[in-house]
Every structure is written in structure tokens, then in C-alpha cells.
């Protein structure tokens, strides 16, 4: 086990009572000559251990694609994803008689592609990677009423018989274009997958023959396009973070210009993989040549690695805090400061340090993300932003959590007012055997989005993009 320190400011109040017909002196009788409150501080050691997480919630609007090896821990992380496409509001194509037909006189698409736009990536921009795009099955679509985790099995949803499956090679840096075009903030990096134009033709045909399939995204996904699996099928060295995914169908149609003449113009309809529909990341962490996870407890630090991977479990020493004469004390402030160890490996491709840590009770970790909760400073807390100056994270005041844990254990164990400390300890021991995680919390690297409205300020936390660190205490 490893150590993290918890600093407490504890106040013990002496309560006095008085009865007097003259209420003008009640205050003086209750608090005479001083406030009769004593306060002191104390430092406790917190036990921590590294926990290997098989998976985390996969439902997200941020998708990761690629495969990298963490140079510090030598863990290979591969990520890919399944994505559905949202039907735009008031979706409408030109009237059928306006569409340019093919030689057989049928409506046809000119081309069709999927574009993965990204700004952020990790690793080597020149690494050659392989992407396999596979159509999902209409027989088993991703269900918006279910929760999926990063150990999802994509092959359960793939239509292996689909003629529209494609594979492409790509690199983060597009060497086919001049540097002046691919450098700077104005250039939007993208991976382009050209689908058979027949896919676009079938989509357009469905629109004109079955307009009911295009009433909403639900009907569109179940009857026209269930989505695609974007598989990282080869290569190691880069992992990109998508910012936008669009499926585009290109066509031509007739219209009348300002001069009143018939003219043919190019048209394009985009379907986006947006928050209105599902995207599910799959993450696989392989540990060949890495530190044996079972041996991590023997080290002087604990680890945090995302996506999924490794989290730190921490035990709050409630029994020590409320032992003996401190049982009735109130906790005014409890601060946890966690120091980060510096990387031992010098590499250009080191994963970044997570900006924030979420502390949440171990048994409530799953529900926190599933129900999209916010840190409430009661049973879940968001750390301060990582300070490179102090090289540390800080939870400024977790006093409410400690108080809640004390009350929960007292109620669960059936503690009564007249119980001696020995009696309380016996009851605690029996209750803790049935509730081993009662005072355990998890430290999880998270990405934080700040939202502000007129009367509300919120912080939304979701599992972080690829990061890693290992921490100790002071």
C-alpha cells in the first residue's frame, strides 16, 4: 500500500445551556467570555492501491482511433469505435423529378464518403495506420436504451455480408499535400474513406420509396443506415481524437437560375455522428513487457492511466479520525494533496498528464458516469487543475464526505447514544465485513467541460482522453 496524506482542521464545541426569565442575558449564559470552541489540526495517512479497470462507459461524443505504446509503462493501447449517424432536422432532398438520373434513367448518387475530422492526436504524425470501416447490421443495431462499455464486442454488431466495407491507410500528416497547406490552425486534419457510390444511391432510393424511414434518426438507423464500425486494423504509433464525423452523399439536380434558365447544380447531404445518436469507443490495453499489474502494490506510487486502464483506489481513515475523544468532533476542513512523480522516461511521445482528477465513492463510480452526474462535493469531488508548479492535485475540502461516511457507518451498524467505544468498535467490525467498500474512493482522470448560464455554473466530467501519471503524497 502507498501513502497519501489527509490534513484535517477539527473543531470540538462545548455546548452550554441556561434557563433565566430575563432573555436579555441568554446569549451571555450560553457563550460566556469566549466561544468555548477548541480547534486543532491533524494529518492522517491514506492507503492507496492501483486498480486495473477492464472497461469504462463507452457511450460518448468523443471517439478515439489508433494504437500507441506508452513509453513510460510500455502498455499498448488500441482504440476504435462504432458510430451512428443523425438525421438532420427537417431533412429533405430535392424532388425526384429534379434529380439527375444515370444512363438507365434511375436516381443515382455521384459519390459517397465518410470524413473523420480531428485536431488532437498522440504519437508520431508520420506513422502509417490502417483503418477498416464496416457497416453495422440492421438486425442488431446499437440500442439507445442500453449502456455500453469499452470492452464492447463490435463484431456482434457488424454486417459481415455488406458490400460497402472499406479499408484505407492514413497518417496524421498528409504527405500528399504541401507543408504550407497542412500546417497552421486553418488546416483541418481529416481521414477520408470513399464508399461505393452505390451506398449513396441506395440511401437516396430509400428516401423516395420510403419517406417514413426519414422522419427521425430512430427510423433512419433501423431501416436505412445503422452506422459503421471504425476499426483500428493495423499500425502502431498514433491515436487521434475525432472532433467531427460526417457521412456525405453527393448528387446533382436541376434548378432554375436567376435568369430563369434550367441549370444543373451540385448537391451534398451530410449526416453527422453527433450527440443525438450513439458513438461507442472500444479500448484494449495490452501489457506485454509492461509492469505486472499484480506487482503494482509493491511500488512506492499508484498509477492512473486512461482510457480505462489503471485507476487509484484510496481508503479514507474514518476510524482513526473519529477514534476516542474525537468521536463527537466536527470536521471543518479536510484537504487532500496528491503529488505527481516526474516521468522516468524521456520521450517525444509521452502521454500528457491529466488535467483533473475525479474522486468518487467506489461503489458509486459506475452510476456517476451512467447517470451523467456532476461532482456534488458530498460523495464526489473534482480536484483543482493540475499545477505544474506544485506538481500536484488538490481536493480543497472533503469534510462533508468524511462526515457522511461516519454517519452512514453509525446508522448501518446500529450505534446508540450510550454505546462505549468498545461496543461501537464491535458493531463497526461486523458491519464493515458486509460493506468492505464503505470508505473507499476512486481517483479517475477526467476531461472537464465548463458550462455557464445566467443562473447556473456547472462542471461536466467524463473519462479522460489518453493520459497517464503516477502519484505519491506529501
What are these regions (language model features)?
Residues 2-12, 16-474:
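Secreted, disulfide-rich extracellular signaling modules
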Amino acid at each position: 500500500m502507498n501513502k497519501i496524506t489527509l490534513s484535517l482542521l477539527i473543531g470540538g464545541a462545548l455546548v452550554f445551556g441556561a434557563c433565566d426569565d430575563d432573555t436579555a442575558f441568554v446569549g451571555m449564559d450560553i457563550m460566556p467570555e469566549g466561544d468555548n470552541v477548541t480547534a486543532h489540526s491533524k494529518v492522517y495517512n491514506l492507503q492507496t492501491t492501483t486498480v486495473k479497470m477492464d472497461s469504462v462507459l463507452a457511450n460518448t461524443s468523443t471517439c478515439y482511433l489508433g494504437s500507441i505504446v506508452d513509453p513510460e509503462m510500455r502498455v499498448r493501447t488500441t482504440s476504435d469505435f462504432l458510430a451512428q449517424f443523425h438525421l438532420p432536422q427537417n431533412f429533405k432532398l430535392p424532388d425526384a423529378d429534379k434529380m439527375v438520373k444515370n444512363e438507365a434513367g434511375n436516381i443515382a448518387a455521384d459519390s459517397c464518403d465518410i470524413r473523420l475530422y480531428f485536431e488532437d492526436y498522440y504519437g508520431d504524425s508520420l506513422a502509417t495506420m490502417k483503418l477498416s470501416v464496416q457497416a453495422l447490421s440492421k438486425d442488431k443495431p446499437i440500442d439507445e436504451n442500453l449502456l455500453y462499455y469499452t470492452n464492447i464486442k463490435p463484431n456482434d454488431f457488424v454486417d459481415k455480408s455488406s458490400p460497402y466495407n472499406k479499408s484505407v491507410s492514413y497518417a496524421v500528416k498528409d504527405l500528399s499535400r504541401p507543408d504550407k497547406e497542412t500546417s497552421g490552425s486553418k488546416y483541418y486534419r481529416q481521414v477520408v474513406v470513399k464508399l461505393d457510390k452505390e451506398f449513396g444511391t441506395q440511401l437516396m432510393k430509400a428516401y423516395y420509396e420510403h419517406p417514413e424511414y426519414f422522419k427521425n434518426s430512430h427510423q433512419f438507423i433501423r431501416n436505412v443506415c445503422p452506422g459503421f464500425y471504425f476499426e483500428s486494423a493495423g499500425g502502431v504509433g498514433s491515436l487521434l481524437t475525432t472532433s467531427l464525423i460526417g457521412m456525405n452523399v453527393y448528387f446533382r439536380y436541376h434548378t432554375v437560375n436567376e435568369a430563369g434558365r434550367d441549370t444543373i447544380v451540385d448537391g451534398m447531404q451530410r449526416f453527422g455522428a453527433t450527440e443525438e445518436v450513439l458513438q461507442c469507443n472500444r479500448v484494449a490495453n495490452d501489457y506485454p513487457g509492461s509492469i505486472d499489474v499484480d506487482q503494482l502494490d509493491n511500488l512506492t506510487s499508484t498509477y492512473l492511466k486512461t482510457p480505462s486502464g489503471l485507476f487509484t483506489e484510496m481508503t479514507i481513515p474514518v476510524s482513526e479520525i473519529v477514534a476516542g475523544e474525537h468521536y463527537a468532533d466536527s470536521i471543518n476542513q479536510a484537504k487532500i494533496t496528491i503529488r505527481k512523480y516526474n516521468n522516468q522516461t524521456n520521450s517525444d511521445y509521452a502521454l500528457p498528464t491529466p488535467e483533473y482528477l475525479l474522486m468518487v465513492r467506489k461503489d458509486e463510480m459506475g452510476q456517476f458516469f451512467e447517470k451523467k452526474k456532476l461532482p456534488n462535493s458530498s460523495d464526489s469531488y473534482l480536484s483543482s487543475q493540475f499545477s505544474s508548479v506544485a506538481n500536484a492535485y488538490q481536493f480543497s475540502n472533503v469534510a462533508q464526505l468524511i462526515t457522511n461516511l461516519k454517519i452512514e457507518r453509525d446508522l448501518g451498524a446500529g450505534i446508540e447514544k450510550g454505546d462505549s467505544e468498545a461496543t461501537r468498535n464491535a458493531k463497526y467490525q461486523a458491519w464493515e465485513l458486509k460493506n468492505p467498500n464503505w470508505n473507499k474512493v476512486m481517483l479517475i482522470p477526467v476531461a472537464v467541460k465548463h458550462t455557464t448560464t445566467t443562473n447556473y455554473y456547472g462542471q461536466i466530467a467524463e473519462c479522460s482522453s489518453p493520459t497517464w501519471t503516477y502519484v505519491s503524497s506529501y
